[in-house]
């Protein structure tokens, strides 16, 4: 379900640089929106490592930070997705949580609402002291500069589930019909408690995670829950009411489908009332090179909705797959934010290699440094310009008159020339263009250079195969 199936056009664009040196022309008239930022989900890694100040610094600031003996450039994530857990180990009225035999303890996120005896969040049916590490990292992220927070759910509390198993029940709805509203109450109460007691204001609340998928089974490896589209619509209505009744400014985001095509189908299945409630469409990037990103963008744009790629992950530690899929998003999906899934994990998935159950850390993967090229330079508030090809992202900071270009070369070594002459002011002749280099095949991890000059609105740089570079051009006025 996570194989890479690139359409023929995208394959041609990815591979064309192998044939000849390239000139890329920047379009100063383009504008795909204001960038909201880069982010990460806290489940599951923060349950394990949420007490670590060094990890908070390396993920949420742009400071250089030593982690496990390796000095890393901070990624500067400003978006945090906090997970509302579904698990508890208590018994009530003869019922206890059913646990999948295949779920790791690190993936069982503690929930606050322990039983159905009372909906009063100040009662003994609630325990606000659980999930200490994830809550700690939430605070550390804020202290390091994170400023957009989302609350999301992978599954309702176990006792709201038909089979009392928060890992799911396959292709059938696992949320009990009499608990549709309670799932919304649970999320709204967390949002209210966070605002009052944690001083965290969730910009958005998401009640689902890949809800149309059928792989959320009782023997699954993580929390999950299938929702039919009609059930989603009902819960969305309840969630909007519960947030509003508490005087919260948090809005409803939906539906975090696994693929672009599922997101299209779900959105088209909502009636106008449900669409009016949803203020942002969240989608996951697990269709890799497939799917109609362009169609989903058109639907969101026509409806006046924001659009995020709210979760992406893959097992390619080199960062190449991530970069290619992310640039397809920039080319066709045009999200205003992009969120990685597991900051710490094994088997290529983690930006830093680690084991969330054994609490061990290794080193940063090459993927970490590839992502740093984007997150450290394309920053919140910048204007996103048209990609001159599917390997290149371009952003502009009007306040500092700085143009940021991030590009990768996956073919043979070559020289790439960047043409800024369509801009009103294309930098100063002879000015230095700082660049940062990551060589995915070995060499530079994240190294800065000052050996590039701009003349007559153009500059050139040599690229080895598998090299990602960022350039910052000062003194640029687009129009």
Swiss-Prot record:
It is an enzyme of class 3 (hydrolase). GO terms for biological process: polysaccharide catabolic process. Its EC number is 3.2.1.164. Residues 1-20 form the signal peptide. One of its GO terms (molecular function) is hydrolase activity, hydrolyzing O-glycosyl compounds. Loses 30% of activity after 10 minutes incubation at 50 degrees Celsius, activity is abolished after 10 minutes incubation at 60 degrees Celsius. It comes from the Eukaryota. InterPro entries: 6GAL-like, 6GAL/EXGAL, Glyco_hydro_b, Glycoside_hydrolase_SF. SUPFAM superfamilies: (Trans)glycosidases. Glycans are attached at residues 89, 271, 358. Optimum pH is 4.3. Stable between pH 3.0 and 11.0 in the presence of BSA, and pH 4.0 and 9.5 in the absence of BSA. It catalyses: Endohydrolysis of (1->6)-beta-D-galactosidic linkages in arabinogalactan proteins and (1->3):(1->6)-beta-galactans to yield galactose and beta-(1->6)-galactaobiose as the final products. The active site is at 210 (proton donor), 311 (nucleophile). Pfam families: Glyco_hydr_30_2 (PF14587). Belongs to the glycosyl hydrolase 5 (cellulase A) family. PANTHER family: ENDO-BETA-1,6-GALACTANASE, ENDO-BETA-1,6-GALACTANASE-LIKE DOMAIN-CONTAINING PROTEIN. Hydrolyzes galactooligomers with a degree of polymerization higher than 3. Hydrolyzes radish root arabinogalactan-protein. Does not hydrolyze dextran, arabinan, starch, laminarin, beta-1,4- and beta-1,3-galactans, larch wood arabinogalactan or acid-insoluble polygalacturonic acid. This is Endo-beta-1,6-galactanase.
């Amino acid at each position: 379900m996570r194989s890479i199936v690139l359409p023929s056009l995208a394959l041609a664009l990815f591979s064309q640089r192998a044939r000849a040196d390239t000139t890329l022309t920047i379009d100063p008239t383009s504008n795909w929106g204001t960038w909201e930022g880069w982010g990460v989900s806290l489940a599951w890694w923060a349950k394990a490592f949420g007490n670590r100040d060094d990890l908070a610094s390396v993920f949420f600031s742009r400071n250089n930070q030593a982690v496990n003996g390796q000095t890393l450039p901070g990624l500067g994530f400003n978006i945090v997705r906090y997970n509302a857990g579904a698990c508890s180990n208590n018994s009530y009225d003869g019922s206890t949580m059913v646990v999948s035999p295949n779920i790791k303890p690190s993936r069982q996120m503690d929930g606050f609402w322990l039983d159905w005896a009372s909906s009063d969040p100040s009662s003994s049916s609630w325990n606000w002291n659980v999930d200490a590490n994830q809550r700690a990292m939430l605070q550390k992220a804020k202290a390091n500069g994170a400023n957009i927070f989302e609350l999301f759910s992978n599954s309702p509390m176990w006792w709201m589930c038909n089979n009392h198993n928060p890992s799911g029940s396959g292709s059938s709805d696992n949320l009990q019909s009499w608990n549709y509203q309670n799932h919304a109450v649970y999320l709204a109460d967390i949002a209210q408690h966070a605002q009052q007691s944690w001083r965290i204001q969730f910009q958005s609340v998401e009640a689902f995670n890949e809800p149309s998928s059928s792989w959320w089974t009782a023997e699954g490896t993580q929390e999950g829950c299938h929702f039919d589209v009609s059930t989603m619509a009902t819960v969305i209505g309840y969630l909007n009411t519960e947030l509003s009744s508490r005087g919260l400014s948090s809005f409803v985001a939906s539906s975090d489908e696994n693929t672009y095509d599922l997101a299209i189908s779900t959105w088209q299945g909502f009636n106008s009332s449900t669409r009016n409630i949803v203020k942002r469409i969240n989608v996951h990037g697990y269709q890799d090179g497939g799917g109609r990103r362009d169609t989903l963008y058109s639907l969101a744009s026509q409806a006046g909705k924001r659009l995020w790629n709210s979760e992406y992950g893959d097992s390619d530690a080199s960062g190449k797959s991530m970069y290619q899929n992310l640039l397809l998003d920039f080319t066709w999906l045009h999200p205003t934010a992009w969120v990685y899934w597991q900051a710490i994990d094994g088997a290529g998935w983690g930006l830093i290699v680690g084991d969330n159950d054994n609490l061990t850390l290794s080193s940063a993967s090459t993927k970490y440094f590839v992502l740093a090229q984007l997150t450290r330079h394309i920053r919140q508030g910048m204007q996103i310009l048209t990609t001159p090809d599917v390997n290149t992202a371009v952003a502009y900071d009007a306040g500092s008159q700085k143009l940021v270009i991030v590009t990768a070369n996956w073919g043979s070594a070559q020289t790439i020339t960047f043409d800024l002459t369509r801009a009103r002011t294309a930098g100063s002749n002879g000015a230095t263009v700082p660049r940062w280099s990551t060589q995915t095949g070995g060499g530079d991890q994240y190294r800065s250079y000052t050996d590039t000059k701009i003349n007559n609105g153009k500059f050139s740089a040599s690229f080895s195969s598998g090299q990602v570079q960022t350039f910052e051009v000062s003194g640029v006025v687009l129009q």
